[in-house]
Amino acid sequence: MPSTFESQLFFSRPFLSKRQIQRAQKNTISDYRNYNQKKLAVFKFLSDLCVQLKFPRKTLETAVYFYQRYHLFNRFETEVCYTVATSCLTLGCKEVETIKKTNDICTLSLRLRNVVKINTDILENFKKRVFQIELRILESCSFDYRVNNYVHIDEYVIKIGRELSFDYKLCNLAWVIAYDALKLETILVIPQHSIALAILKIAYELLDNKNWSSKRYSLFETDEKSVNEAYFDIVNFYINSFDMCDLQRHLPADLLPIGVERFMELKKNAGPESGLPQIPDHLLNADPYITITRDNNVQERRYVLSLELINGESSINSSTRHA
């Protein structure tokens, strides 16, 4: 009887549509409200870690991206979410080259969670769990380093703002908004430069500027649909969850207070919501990438960045079967 070798091949998809994300989460998240509440708590936890370890915001952004990608393909469990978050941060440090000893990160992580007596055994056991989760995080991203390897949202805000000759006041406001944007799943949907443009547009309008030009989008290799998707995500967040935002607590000193009414006005002036086209149900439910629960007992899983490799292997397998 011939032996069989089970193998899976995945094509990297660093960005997914909202409906694809929701479909993937059906397999991993039983209570989305609980997940979202805990995600905001984890975001604060990661922010506190980054502040105390003096990490730049790009490290936080990378860790948050990893955390949300992880839970697309791995079950959300309340009791281990802070361990997952710590693992995301240690991996994020390597990704964006903000190097810090794992001991320092793990020790501070335990302290922030009120672990009183941190001895060598507790620290080493925690580090083992953190390292074990790293592989799952990398697999959830298909080992694709392109997303977090280059320029990040806050950096794009400054670079694009300077390119468009926006003043310090506008860019500073946009930089604060960019922090709140990290709390959303938008970073799983839209590339960083498109999110940065949407944030600049919001800051531009909050300062009562008129006639924002969509002609700018082609200059920065994006399009109106992508920018609108991020724009409405962020505006809706401020309308629906203004009490959870950091903008109201960190508003630049030279600006008048901004309330939820201001964002409702922006949405009204923007007209009907628009954004990226959504995938129909029949295609969504036929997509194994998001519908099939990942089996960690499979003997081999491989990840590629090019469809040509998948098509080439399919052709070889087909030829072998018919030989």
Swiss-Prot record:
InterPro entries: Cyclin-like_dom (IPR013763), Cyclin-like_sf (IPR036915), Cyclin/Ssn8 (IPR043198), Cyclin_N (IPR006671)
A Pfam family matched in the record: Cyclin_N
Claim: NAD is one of the keywords in the record: no
PTM summary: Phosphorylated. Ubiquitinated. Phosphorylation and ubiquitination lead to degradation in growth-related way by the ubiquitin-proteasome pathway. Neither phosphorylation nor degradation requires association with CTK1.
GO molecular function: cyclin-dependent protein serine/threonine kinase activator activity; cyclin-dependent protein serine/threonine kinase regulator activity
Record's GO cellular component terms: carboxy-terminal domain protein kinase complex; CTDK-1 complex; cyclin/CDK positive transcription elongation factor complex; cytosol; nucleolus; nucleoplasm; nucleus
Subcellular location: Nucleus, Nucleolus
Disruption phenotype: Null mutants are viable, but grow more slowly than wild-type cells at 30 degrees Celsius. They are cold-sensitive, failing to grow at 12 degrees Celsius. They display flocculent growth in liquid media and they show abnormal cell morphologies, for example, a significant fraction of the cells are greatly enlarged. Deletion mutant is sensitive to the DNA synthesis inhibitor hydroxyurea (HU) and UV irradiation.
One GO BP annotation of this record: positive regulation of translational fidelity
Entry-linked Gene3D superfamilies: Cyclin-like
Keywords: Cyclin, DNA damage, mRNA processing, Nucleus, Phosphoprotein, Transcription, Ubl conjugation
PANTHER family: CYCLIN
Subunit details: CTDK-I consists of three subunits, CTK1, CTK2 and CTK3 (also called alpha, beta and gamma). Interacts with CTK1. Heterodimerization with CTK3 is required to protect this subunit from degradation.
Miscellaneous comment in the UniProt entry for this protein: Present with 1590 molecules/cell in log phase SD medium.
Descriptive protein name: CTD kinase subunit beta
